[in-house]
C-alpha cells in the first residue's frame, strides 16, 4: 500500500489536493514543501571517480566504471529518477546525457572532435541530479562531486620532419669518424608511439657513409680529398609507426686535407687600472683549428676569484650599511656583529677581522643574550647569511647547527633551527599550541651541491608560514621535502638562542652545547615580521667584478652565450669559428668598485669542439692568464672647520641648543704625480706631487664626547630625524656620542653634521665641552683625520659692594695662550661684545665712586691719585647703594697687541696699590671673586679700542644690576 500512496503524492500535488480553504496561498506552500520533503528524501549517488579514453577525432568516451546514477527514492516517480548529469568546468569539450532516467544510465561524449596534439588529457567534475518531487518542482537534489579523468588516444596523422632542411660537415681525409654529424627529425603526434623517431635511413646509394637509429652519420672508409672533395647524401626518417618523413634532408660532407690547433695572439698578464670600466681581455685572439672538421665550438671563460673575500670582490661596507644601500626594510638584527661592549657574545669566536668572517671548527658556539631577538618571530621573517661549508666529517654525520632556539633548562625542545645534515640544508620551525593546534609543516629540506662545495654562497630564507623559500646566490629553490609535526606544548621554560651549535638544556646531566657547526659564517641576520624582496636579495649578494661583453648587439648570428649569476663564468657556443673569434674579442673584465681589492684574478679559457657527432674532435689547449688589479689611489679624507668657539649660557639652555659644526667641510684628496715642464732642457722629468680632490662615499661618521660621557639629566646631542631620513642615513645616540651611518656622499654627511646640536640645561657648572669627529669609507678601510672641537660657555659674574671689583679688570692668564685666525663667526661675536678696554675704564670709574662713597680717607687719597692718572678716560660718575652689583662682562674682544695689555695691567697694579690699605677688610671676598672669575671659561683676544671710540651705555635695573654693553 505504501508505494501506491507514494505514487499518488505527485498527482495530488499537481491537482492542488490538500489546499483547503481558509489557509490561503501560504498554507498551500507550506504543505507542498512538507510533501516534497517527505517524498524526495535522498540524493542521487554516483562513483567517486571515473577514468575514460577517447580516440582522437572521435566523440565517444569509454568510461570505467560506466556512468550510472542511483537514487534510494526509487521507484518513486521524479524523486527516484535521474534527470541530468552536469559537468563543472570552463570550456570543456564534453557533455553528459541521460540515457535512462529510471535506471540512471548516462553517457559522456565529446561536443566536437578531440585533438590530442592540443591536449592529451582532461580532468573535470561531474554530478548527477534527480527530478525532484514533481514536474513543477525545481528543487532537484544533486549527488556528490565525482572526478573524471579522460585520456586522448593518439592517431598517427603526422609524418616526421627534419629540424634543418640541409646539413653540412667538414671532415679530414684519412680518418675514420665514429660520428661526422647528427641529423634530427621530429614528429608532431602526441603519443610516444607516433611522436618518437625510431629509425633513420640513407636514401642515396653507393656512398661510404652509414647512419644509426640516433641520426649519427659516420664514414665507413677513409676518405680521400684527391678522390672526391664533397659528398651529398639524402637521409629520411621513420617514426615508431613506420611512417616515413614527408621530405628527405640533404647532408653535405666536405673533405679537407690534413696542423696544431690552439688559441693565438693572447696575453698572459692583463693589468686593470681601477676606475677604467670595462676592459677587453682578448682583443686579438683567434682560434687555429688547422682546418679541422668543426661543426660547433663551445668556449668557457672562467674568472677564478674564490680566494678573494666571499668568492668575489664585493662591497666591504658593514652589514647595516649594505642593507640600507640595497633598500632593505628596517629591523634587521645582526647575530654575528663585531665584538664590542654591547655585542660581546662573538668575542670568543674565531674571526677574520678584515672581512668579519667567523670560523667554526666544531668546538665552539655563541649564546645570543635575551632580548636581542624577540621571542615571537611572527609568521613572516627572513634569515640571511654567507656560508662556506665542506663535506661533513665522519661516515654518519651529525647535525651541524647554524642557528638554534631551544629550551634553556629542563627540556631539549628545538623551537626553530637552521642546520646542515648530510649536505642538506634543513630549517626547523615548531609552532606553539597558542599559535596553532593542528598538524603543520615543521621541517623544510633542501638538497644542493653548493652546500658542501667549500665555496662561499649567499643564503636567504624567506618565511611566510607555512611557505618557506630559499634563495641561494639570488636563485630560488623550493624544498624537496617538507615534514609535518604537532605544535610544541606550552610551558614556562625560557629559551636560548645560539649560533654555531645548539644548546642542550635537558636530558643531560649538565646543560651544554651540541651539534657543532664546521665551516665559516658571515653576516648572519634575522628580520622578524618582514620578508626580503628578490631585488634586495640580488643586491646584497651581487659581485662588483666579473666578465662582461662589450656591445652585445654586434655579436654574430648563431652565437649563444650564458653567464652564471655572479658573472664569473661565461659560456659561448656557436657553429661558426669566425663569429666565435669576434665574440671572444669582445669579452671584457669589469670592476665597478671605486676602490677594488688589489691582486691577481686568475683567468682560464677552455674550449670544446664538436666535429659532427664526436664529443671532441680536436684537442685545444686551455688558456691560462691572469688579471692584475692594480692598487687603487688611496684617498686622504680631511675634516675642516672651526675648532673652538664660545656661546652665551642662554644659548645652551634654549630649545635649539648650540650648533656644533656649522661650517664643517669634508674633503677627500689624493696625490697625483706630474712631470715638470723643463724635461726638454734637462733631459729628465722631475716629478712633483699635486693634490687633486676626488669624490666618493662615506659609510659612517662618529662624534665622540671627550672628557667623560654626557649626563642625560642635563645635556644631550640632538639631530632631527628628518635631516637623516631625507638623505637616506641613520644614526644611533648614546651618552658616549653620536654615530651617523649609511652609504652616502660626503656632501650628505656635511649637511647632516651642520644640523647636529648640543644642549645643556645647567650650563653654569660647565666650562668647556670637547668633541671629536672621525669619518670612514668602506667600514674603516679609509678613515679621516680626528677633528677636535672645543665649546666654551660665557658666564655672568655677580659681585657685591663689599668685594673688590678692581681685580676683574686683570686679564686672565689663559688669555695669552689662545690664538685663532679670524672667522666669520668671530666677527659676529665681536660686534655684540664690548671691548675689554672699555670695560676696564668703566669699572675703574665705578670703583672710584665706590671708594668715595665709603668715606675712607686712605681710600680717598688712593683714588685721587688714580683719578689724576685716568682723568682723561673718565666719562661719568655714578653713586649706588649697598645692594649687590651685577656686571655682565664679555671678554671676547681682541687686543691690538701686547702693549695695550701691558698698559692695562699697569693701571690695575696702580689701582691695587692705591687700595692696598683698605683691601684687608675684603680679602675673603677676593678669594670668592677669583673663583667666579675662573669659572668664566676660556675667551678669545679681542681688539681693544679707546673709550672715545667705543661709547658705552649704562642702565639701572630694579634689582640694582648694571648691564654694561658696547
From Swiss-Prot:
Gene disruption phenotype: Mice show a deficit of GABAergic interneurons, associated with hyperactivity, deficient spatial memory and social behavior. Mice show a selective reduction in functional inhibitory synapses, associated with a selective reduction of parvalbumin interneurons in hippocampus and cortex. In neurons, a reduction of symmetric (inhibitory) synaptic density, length of synaptic contacts and postsynaptic density is observed. Moreover, cortical neurons are characterized by the predominance of the simplified type of synapses with the emergence of negative curvature of the synaptic zone.
Sites carrying sugar chains: 58, 100, 344, 376, 720, 733
Location of the region described as Disordered in the Swiss-Prot/TrEMBL record: 890-966
Superkingdom per UniProt: Eukaryota
Pfam families named among the record's database cross-references: Cadherin (PF00028), CLSTN_C (PF19699)
Annotated SUPFAM superfamilies: Cadherin-like (SSF49313), Concanavalin A-like lectins/glucanases (SSF49899)
Domain notes: Binds synaptic Ca(2+) with its cytoplasmic domain.
Full protein name: Calsyntenin-2
Lineage of source species: Eukaryota, Metazoa, Chordata, Craniata, Vertebrata
Amino acid at each position: 500500500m505504501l508505494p501506491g500512496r507514494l505514487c499518488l503524492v505527485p498527482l495530488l500535488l499537481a491537482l492542488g489536493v490538500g489546499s483547503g480553504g481558509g489557509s490561503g496561498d501560504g498554507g498551500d506552500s507550506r504543505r507542498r514543501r512538507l510533501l516534497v520533503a517527505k517524498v524526495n528524501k535522498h540524493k542521487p549517488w554516483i562513483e567517486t571517480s571515473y577514468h575514460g579514453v577517447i580516440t582522437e577525432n572521435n566523440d565517444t568516451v569509454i568510461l570505467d566504471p560506466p556512468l550510472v546514477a542511483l537514487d534510494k527514492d526509487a521507484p518513486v516517480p521524479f524523486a527516484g529518477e535521474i534527470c541530468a548529469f552536469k559537468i563543472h568546468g570552463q570550456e570543456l569539450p564534453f557533455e553528459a546525457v541521460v540515457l535512462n532516467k529510471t535506471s540512471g544510465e548516462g553517457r559522456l561524449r565529446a561536443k566536437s572532435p578531440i585533438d590530442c596534439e592540443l591536449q592529451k588529457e582532461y580532468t573535470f567534475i561531474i554530478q548527477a541530479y534527480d527530478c525532484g518531487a514533481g514536474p513543477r518542482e525545481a528543487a532537484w537534489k544533486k549527488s556528490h562531486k565525482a572526478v573524471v579523468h579522460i585520456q586522448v588516444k593518439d592517431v598517427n596523422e603526422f609524418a616526421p620532419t627534419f629540424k634543418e632542411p640541409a646539413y653540412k660537415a667538414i671532415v679530414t681525409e684519412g680518418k675514420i669518424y665514429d660520428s661526422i654529424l647528427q641529423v634530427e627529425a621530429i614528429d608532431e603526434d602526441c603519443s610516444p608511439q607516433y611522436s618518437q623517431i625510431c629509425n633513420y635511413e640513407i636514401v642515396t646509394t653507393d656512398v661510404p657513409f652509414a647512419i644509426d637509429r640516433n641520426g649519427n652519420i659516420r664514414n665507413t672508409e677513409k676518405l680521400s680529398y684527391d678522390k672526391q672533395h664533397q659528398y651529398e647524401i639524402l637521409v629520411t626518417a621513420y617514426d615508431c609507426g613506420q611512417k616515413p618523413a614527408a621530405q628527405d634532408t640533404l647532408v653535405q660532407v666536405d673533405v679537407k686535407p690534413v696542423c696544431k690547433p690552439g688559441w693565438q695572439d693572447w696575453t698572459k698578464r692583463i693589468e686593470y687600472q681601477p676606475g677604467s670600466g670595462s676592459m677587453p681581455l682578448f682583443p686579438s685572439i683567434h682560434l687555429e683549428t688547422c682546418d679541422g672538421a668543426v661543426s660547433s665550438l663551445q668556449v668557457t671563460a672562467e674568472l677564478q676569484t674564490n680566494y678573494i673575500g666571499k668568492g668575489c670582490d664585493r662591497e666591504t661596507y658593514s652589514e647595516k650599511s649594505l642593507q640600507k644601500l640595497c633598500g632593505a626594510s628596517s629591523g634587521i638584527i645582526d647575530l654575528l656583529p663585531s665584538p664590542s661592549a654591547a655585542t660581546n657574545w662573538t668575542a670568543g669566536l674565531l674571526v677574520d677581522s678584515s672581512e668579519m668572517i667567523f670560523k667554526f671548527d666544531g668546538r665552539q658556539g655563541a649564546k645570543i643574550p635575551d632580548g636581542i631577538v624577540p621571542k615571537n618571530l611572527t609568521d613572516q621573517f627572513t634569515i640571511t647569511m654567507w656560508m662556506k661549508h665542506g663535506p661533513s666529517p665522519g661516515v654518519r654525520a651529525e647535525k651541524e647547527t647554524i642557528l638554534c632556539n631551544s629550551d634553556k633548562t629542563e627540556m631539549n625542545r628545538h623551537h626553530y633551527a637552521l642546520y646542515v645534515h648530510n649536505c642538506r640544508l634543513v630549517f626547523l620551525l615548531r609552532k606553539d599550541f597558542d599559535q596553532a593546534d593542528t598538524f603543520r609543516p615543521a621541517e623544510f629540506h633542501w638538497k644542493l651541491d653548493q652546500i658542501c662545495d667549500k665555496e662561499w654562497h649567499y643564503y636567504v630564507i624567506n618565511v611566510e608560514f607555512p611557505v618557506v623559500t630559499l634563495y641561494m646566490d639570488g636563485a630560488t629553490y623550493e624544498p624537496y621535502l617538507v615534514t609535518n609535526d604537532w605544535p610544541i606544548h606550552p610551558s614556562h621554560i625560557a629559551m636560548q638562542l645560539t649560533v654555531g651549535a645548539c644548546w642542550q638544556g635537558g636530558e643531560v646531566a649538565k646543560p651544554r652545547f651540541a651539534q657543532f657547526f664546521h665551516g665559516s659564517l658571515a653576516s648572519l641576520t634575522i628580520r622578524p615580521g618582514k620578508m626580503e624582496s628578490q631585488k634586495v636579495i640580488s643586491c646584497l649578494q651581487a659581485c662588483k667584478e666579473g666578465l662582461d661583453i662589450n656591445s652585445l648587439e654586434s655579436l654574430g648570428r648563431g652565437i649563444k652565450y650564458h653567464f652564471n649569476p655572479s658573472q664569473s663564468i661565461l659560456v659561448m657556443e656557436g657553429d661558426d669559428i669566425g663569429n666565435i673569434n669576434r665574440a671572444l674579442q669582445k669579452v671584457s673584465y669589469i670592476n665597478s668598485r671605486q676602490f677594488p681589492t688589489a691582486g691577481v684574478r686568475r683567468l682560464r679559457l677552455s674550449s670544446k669542439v664538436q666535429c659532427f657527432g664526436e664529443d671532441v674532435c680536436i684537442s685545444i689547449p686551455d688558456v691560462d692568464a691572469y688579471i692584475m688589479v692594480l692598487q687603487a689611489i688611496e684617498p686622504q679624507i680631511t675634516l675642516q672647520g672651526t675648532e673652538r668657539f664660545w656661546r652665551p649660557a642662554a644659548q645652551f639652555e634654549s630649545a635649539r641648543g648650540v650648533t656644533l659644526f656649522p661650517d664643517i667641510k669634508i674633503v677627500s684628496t689624493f696625490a697625483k704625480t706630474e712631470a715638470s715642464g723643463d724635461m726638454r732642457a734637462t733631459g729628465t722629468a722631475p716629478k712633483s706631487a699635486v693634490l687633486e680632490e676626488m669624490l666618493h662615499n662615506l659609510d659612517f661618521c662618529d662624534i665622540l664626547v671627550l672628557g667623560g660621557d654626557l649626563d642625560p639629566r642635563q645635556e644631550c646631542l640632538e639631530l632631527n630625524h628628518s635631516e637623516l631620513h631625507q638623505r637616506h642615513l641613520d644614526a644611533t645616540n648614546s651618552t658616549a656620542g653620536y654615530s651617523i651611518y649609511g652609504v652616502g656622499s660626503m656632501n650628505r654627511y656635511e649637511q647632516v653634521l651642520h644640523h647636529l646640536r648640543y644642549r645643556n640645561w645647567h650650563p653654569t657648572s660647565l666650562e668647556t665641552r670637547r668633541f671629536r669627529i672621525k669619518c670612514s669609507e668602506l667600514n674603516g678601510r679609509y678613515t679621516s683625520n680626528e677633528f677636535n672641537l672645543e665649546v666654551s660657555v660665557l658666564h655672568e659674574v655677580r659681585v657685591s659692594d663689599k668685594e673688590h671689583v678692581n681685580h676683574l679688570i686683570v686679564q686672565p692668564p689663559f688669555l695669552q695662550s689662545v690664538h685663532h685666525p679670524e672667522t666669520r663667526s668671530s666677527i659676529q661675536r665681536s660686534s655684540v661684545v664690548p671691548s675689554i678696554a672699555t670695560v676696564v675704564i668703566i669699572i675703574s670709574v665705578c670703583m672710584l665712586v665706590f671708594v668715595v662713597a665709603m668715606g675712607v680717607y686712605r681710600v680717598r687719597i688712593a683714588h685721587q691719585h688714580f683719578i689724576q692718572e685716568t682723568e682723561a678716560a673718565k666719562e661719568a660718575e655714578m653713586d649706588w647703594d649697598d645692594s649687590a652689583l651685577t656686571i655682565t662682562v664679555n671678554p671676547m674682544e681682541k687686543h691690538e697687541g701686547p702693549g695695550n695689555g701691558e698698559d692695562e695691567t699697569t693701571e690695575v697694579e696702580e689701582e691695587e696699590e692705591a687700595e692696598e690699605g683698605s683691601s684687608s677688610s675684603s680679602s675673603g671676598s677676593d678669594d670668592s671673586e677669583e673663583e667666579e672669575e675662573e669659572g668664566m671659561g676660556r675667551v678669545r683676544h679681542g681688539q681693544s679700542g679707546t673709550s672715545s671710540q667705543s661709547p658705552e651705555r649704562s642702565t639701572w635695573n630694579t634689582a640694582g644690576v648694571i648691564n654694561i654693553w658696547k
